């Protein structure tokens, strides 16, 4: 080894040591890669589920007699474990019980649900929710599924140059200008904007019908919520845009009572109020007439009527006083009676507010029935209806993410940057924090944020609302902050008011302060205060995770349950027009009276109205079931290999409900954005229609509580990188200068460079170290886990890196996988977090290990039992098998890998094999990316994989009788059922082929009347063909393998398996295939270099190296330069050097007497084998008297390795070269020199010798070790042929596709080819009897079985269709017969059909006779069959 190492030796586990060539050292432990799934579901079960269920309670009956209250929630453990659910096709779910309390408010009686006799649980059974497994999946009906995360636009406020409102019928209404878009999670989308060439601010919102977008002034909306004109002008400091908005709307005292079309209802009520008031005065009837008038008509108008009556009365009071004081001057009178005038003005403002609310409610078509508060009598008004529409969370929800976005946009601290303030900013003690005329810088912003959080700045004010507006939740948050700034920083002659939100609002609904701050933002844009939003910025998007999707679905179900309960309570309460009388106990209802007068006992009467009788939980159960079975974002988990499963769970989709369509051609949506950095991988995305719509989370990214993707960065202070780190959202990124992780640091982590490359607000530039706020953790945080597993990805073209990332997920787990010699250091993390490895739950010592389980005694002296998965079929039909990698007595730590899963080696990801590859052509067999492989890869099972197919059959109860599992099926040959036992089920270990019976089953036929003599014969000869038919499970077309297991699930089992109705038994047969690599299989490297195996060459014919080592694979060198994936060449040379050093180390360790433990850590081999290997190598060294490695002949080492079941595949030092931070040119040169590879003369290339002739090839050839994968696209799944098969009922042509045993389409161009060769008879057969000539087909079949010449004289169905289409055009079609007669086509077809039908009947009779003869032989054979005994179990 060299003294000056350019690497560090990094021990991944006890058995894995890698040379780490990374330049940036970091101890940062990334988040668990499954956190996005597991933590989200944990949040749902611990918090969201209870919140949603309890949100509808308490519920009161309309008359107030009953109250139903929520008292608690119980989440029970699943009744079946995960593996049982998989085997039985059940859902792994946890039952939910809710504790409800029904109180009779008149008697004080309290009722609760009684104990469930079946389950023994208290409370109401609400339903069952599928439980997430430890690896982040759900078992639904025996199949593993997962929830894909959806990326959607975040609720919040957006400032845009153009926007649109979607209307019905795919219509849109477009707007341009300075637009503030209020985008809720649930509710009406509103736009606030200044129209072109105007200065007034307008609001646009879609009406409830969706047919139109309605426009009104922003001041109209503010007045509708209870602000007066004076309050509006005061808040906005008399801004021009606000004044103009007030001028154009008609909600002012001088307009409100005028007789116009807009004020028709006001004027009518005003006139009626005058008349009633005068009549009331004359008759002295006080308020009777007034109350009668107010209660007439719509209850929503009552508030407006009341206000107008108050105005009339107040006016009369003032007029009366004026009449009494007619000699007093007006000014003096008004001064003396200011209170009266103020009260009248307030009433007028309340009328204006109610009228504005009424107009907006009618304009938007707000559904009054949805307004919950209107149930309470006396509170009905248009103002409350409008407030409920916008301020009730159940109707208008901006969510926590929306509130976060509102604060980020509307707080003053976010809007003052680079502006000169016109007022002092003072604290609560009147100390000046920032004097006026100061240009606000980044440091000032940080100070303002800090002081605002502490509520220490004296700029907070409160919105004053009219008293009528304060009757609902509108008053929850009315605080705002304001400050004046100069419109122009240089001139400083005019100011404008910036009105912002007060910090500290946690409400998830819209507030009046939000609308006020939004209005300010709109007119501030005229003076370049604020900024426009980039809608594609990741800060404006968020992820919907499993907890949010489930929460929304359960909220829907609870709303339906609430409606059902309310209806039941109304009936029980007597609100359904059943109220009889009211006594001192309260309201006596029809239901109560019926119960009281009935013959029921006292106990029965008490139970008549119970908790269970008023709740129906079926909606909850059906919606949850529907979500997990049919929701667009629920998908089968890809279990091809650990990387595929892990990547699947970290997948992000822009499609789904409310998302983007895959047909949308918008490139801006699909493109990479600068804000994706360290959050979404710029490389990994599918090819094709879904490109850019399906994405992957970056390696170190997480999702915060609001659904925003956050990325970690180290904190930098005064040019020094600190140990602590912080997660930032994409919007927070824009506020800081973030340096790349490649900067030079000293031992104290101070940045040495005078200027560093850093990002700020989407652009990259040079900054001094003292300006830097944060620094990247590691370079690999930019890409996803799949891309981070590709070494030298920085040397690959982006398109090829994309293919490499995707193809790693298609790699098939091999029988003996090997971790890559040239890795990136992420292999352990991927395998560990994938969920397929066995991971220790606690610290402890291993007490027992075998192939089935591992037992560890933990530090609490308790036994942890780990059952290993053995040969389980995955969703992709690959083999999931776990192998222990610990030994008895070994000390293990929490989270340590103790067992390998599929495609793992010693805890590391191992998708393929390290293969000796040469880039050379060979007789043209690797033309166009084809791959030539050595026979060694086949013979030694290098790329052999195991595949498991599941075959299921159900034994059913039918109307004709029960089906039966039996060995005695009618009309089935003995050959087909040769592997069945005496019960009719295939034997484990049998090698079955296409058509073999796996499970014998008979189904009863319908009742068929038979003669007595026929029944006698059937009994004598055992003929069941007349009473039952064969419905056995057989091996499908094109399949074969060895039966690995048979599972029988009966409803009568002791473990109580619950089977569907009418199912007696389910039998599952698992067939295993061992697939060797063969011609037609697809292989690939990690750099997007893919190809099909074109030839398997004998080992002796393969080109070989100077020492006689034959190549394993030959790749075409022309596949490298045009594809620009040079990373594969660097991997090739580095891998070869590492393998050569491994050979040297194998001998040198024994020479230096370092002990066998070094073999274990360096090569990852078993302890027993390592001891024996060390002993044998040491003996060889003594025998040869070797002093250094080169003194030992490698052939001797090869023999020793072979005796121990090893090969040079097991020997080789492992390299870690992280992406963007790995081995550079100097490192590769250094390691090649260490391996004694001549790079001075031949640049690392080798002389290759032709295996057929022994002659060297002309030029030097690049040879080395490359990590190659065998992909899921195997020829066994694709190759297919058809001799006899099904036909389409409509066209009568053969079906297509392997699954339907279909034929290959013989298209137009293929017809041309046969025409060119003059193959007339072949062409005739293909287009007629092999296609859709039904009669000709039958005749040909009969001729073949009789040995006659084939004569096809039928008419193809497609020709018949052509003639009908021509007749449809009015053309007369005739046929010229052999005797020169002209016959109409219809008559000719009819005659042909008649003749062919006669022929068919003759053929049918002959065939039936043959079948009957053969059946008789079969029955006699069965009767005399003594080959097996009934008692014998095959």
Curated annotation (Swiss-Prot):
It catalyses: RNA(n) + a ribonucleoside 5'-triphosphate = RNA(n+1) + diphosphate. Keywords: DNA-directed RNA polymerase, Nucleotidyltransferase, Transcription, Transferase. Pfam families: RNA_pol_Rpb2_1, RNA_pol_Rpb2_2, RNA_pol_Rpb2_3, RNA_pol_Rpb2_45, RNA_pol_Rpb2_6, RNA_pol_Rpb2_7. Its EC number is 2.7.7.6. GO terms for cellular component: DNA-directed RNA polymerase complex. One of its GO terms (molecular function) is ribonucleoside binding. It comes from the Bacteria. GO terms for biological process: DNA-templated transcription. It is an enzyme of class 2 (transferase). DNA-dependent RNA polymerase catalyzes the transcription of DNA into RNA using the four ribonucleoside triphosphates as substrates. Belongs to the RNA polymerase beta chain family. The RNAP catalytic core consists of 2 alpha, 1 beta, 1 beta' and 1 omega subunit. When a sigma factor is associated with the core the holoenzyme is formed, which can initiate transcription. PANTHER family: DNA-DIRECTED RNA POLYMERASE I SUBUNIT 2. NCBIfam families: PRK00405.1 (NF001616). This is DNA-directed RNA polymerase subunit beta. It comes from Ureaplasma parvum serovar 3 (strain ATCC 700970).
